[in-house]
Design a protein with these regions (language model features):
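Extracytoplasmic "Venus flytrap"/periplasmic binding protein-like
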Residues: 24, 40-117, 121, 154-155, ...
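Extracytoplasmic/periplasmic solute-binding protein
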Residues: 124-138, 142, 173-233, 277
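Extracytoplasmic "Venus flytrap"
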Residues: 25-40, 58-61, 140-141, 206, ...
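Hinge/lid segment of periplasmic solute-binding proteins
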Residues: 85-143, 208-211, 300-307, 368-374, ...
Length: 438
């Protein structure tokens, strides 16, 4: 266990806190299954601390707008915020979150105790510096599910092998994934026409950006020059990045269901559970629900790390969030008690059991973790290859530009991939020039 010893047991500290003024804390997050699990988990905190927890959960398509507006207005609705990874730069630089370094030091909470990618992704600003604004709360990453039961049907497996000359197994490359999607597109299974894949195409929030980036990374896309920050020409619009964007459009055109022009997490879940698609791109948070679903659970679903690109590179889009104390809260001490409780190994182990994706190394590096769920090893392997979108203070503008460029090309069919990425370089350059970074 990498957590530093606490001066006294968590139970004792929380009991002492209960003798102080009991507070009603509001935790803000997205409305999804992990949030419901956290409500149940938090009953332990209420019992031990004497504080009462309230929750404000907002559907994902509206989550960023609603909560960023709350932060930017200095609102006091939220005492605790589980905010998206890309918000960290703006929240830190604009004073929305409480810096947690002193609190961590005083309470024996070491960032070395957490998966490094989640510390960088959820907690640090500036990136790769020991300045912490959140505790890693929910690890998440884009991966794939596939209908393992369909793959194993002898007649389907034989038809695939006859056409492609290889066995129908989980794809190791994106080229293989596209072959499988094309094979299933329009095929009749159990009297129902099915389709190849569900991928992210949503325009209004972040959907198509998360999906396209998940593929582009493995084709060689880079946000900027590793040796010269914000130097994007030839990195964002490299030949590999262009090929990746062309691939994504080809996958959309060949192998998605009719009407899949505005698909994100919820639509992907519905398409997969209803037996509409053979392959589905989605964040790992969906996997516990699939595993217990009567239609696709109980061994019918396989879990897949993002496949490799044409040169063997393999990366995946980071999801997930850290938990922060909102600087405008009048109940910061009680909010910090919650973070202290949440950071303990016992609570983190229970978080995983409840359906949360713990970022604590003592949990995920436990010898029994990989076999604890059918998707656990895929989660570990995926978290080892993550990359993330910009986390700059101007994240929202950068994202809006990206959403438009990608949707216009992939879904609307306007222009070429080269033109879309050249335009994105222009958009992002203007943004960073306005910020004085170029």
């Amino acid at each position: 266990m990498l957590m530093k010893p606490l001066a006294a047991s968590t139970a004792m500290l929380l009991a002492l806190a209960a003798n102080a003024q009991a507070e009603e804390l509001t935790l803000c997050w997205a409305a999804w299954d992990p949030a419901n699990a956290l409500v149940e988990l938090s009953k332990d905190f209420e019992a031990k601390s004497g504080h009462t927890m309230k929750f404000e959960f907002v559907p994902w398509p509206n989550f960023a707008d609603r909560m960023l507006n709350e932060l930017n207005s200095g609102g006091k609705l939220c005492d605790l915020m589980i905010g998206d990874s890309q918000w960290i730069g703006g929240a830190a630089e604009n004073g929305h979150y409480v810096k947690l370094n002193d609190f961590f030091d005083a309470n024996g909470i070491s960032m070395d105790a957490f998966v490094p990618a989640t510390v960088t992704g959820y907690s640090e600003w500036p990136k790769n510096t020991p300045n912490y604004w959140s505790l890693p709360a929910f690890g998440d990453v884009v991966g794939w599910t596939y209908r393992k039961d369909w793959f194993e049907r002898p007649e389907i497996a034989a038809a695939f092998k006859e056409k492609y000359g290889r066995d129908l197994v989980a794809p190791a490359t994106f080229a293989e994934l596209k072959d499988i999607a094309e094979f299933f597109q329009g095929r009749e299974i159990d009297g129902k026409v099915v389709y190849g894949a569900s991928i992210y195409t949503e325009r209004g929030s972040e959907g198509i950006t998360m999906g396209v980036m998940d593929v582009l990374y493995s084709f060689g896309f880079k946000y900027d020059n590793p040796d010269k920050p914000y130097d994007m020409q030839g990195f964002v619009n490299s030949p590999g990045a262009v090929a990746g964007l062309e691939f994504y459009k080809a996958l959309y055109d060949c192998c998605t269901a009719p009407g899949a022009s505005n698909t994100y997490m919820g639509e992907g879940i519905d398409a997969y559970k209803s037996g509409q698609v053979a392959l589905q791109m989605n964040f790992a948070f969906t996997w516990p629900g699939f595993e217990v679903d009567p239609n696709v659970g109980g061994g019918k679903t396989g879990y897949l790390v993002n496949p490799a690109g044409p040169n063997g590179e393999r990366f995946a889009q980071l999801g997930g969030q850290g938990i922060s104390v909102v600087s405008y809260s009048e109940k910061k001490d009680a909010a910090l008690e919650y973070i202290k409780w949440f950071a303990t190994p016992e609570v983190q182990a229970n978080w995983w059991k409840a359906g949360g994706f713990s970022c604590l190394r003592a949990v995920v590096e436990d010898p029994g973790f990989a076999s604890s769920q059918p998707y656990a090893q895929t989660f570990l392997d995926s978290m080892a290859i993550v990359k993330d979108f910009w986390a700059e203070p101007s994240y929202a503008t950068l994202l809006q530009d990206t959403q438009k460029r990608f949707h216009d090309y992939v879904v609307a069919g306007n222009g070429t991939a080269q033109e879309a990425l050249d335009g994105l370089v222009k958009d992002w350059t203007t943004n960073f020039e306005d910020e004085g970074k170029l």
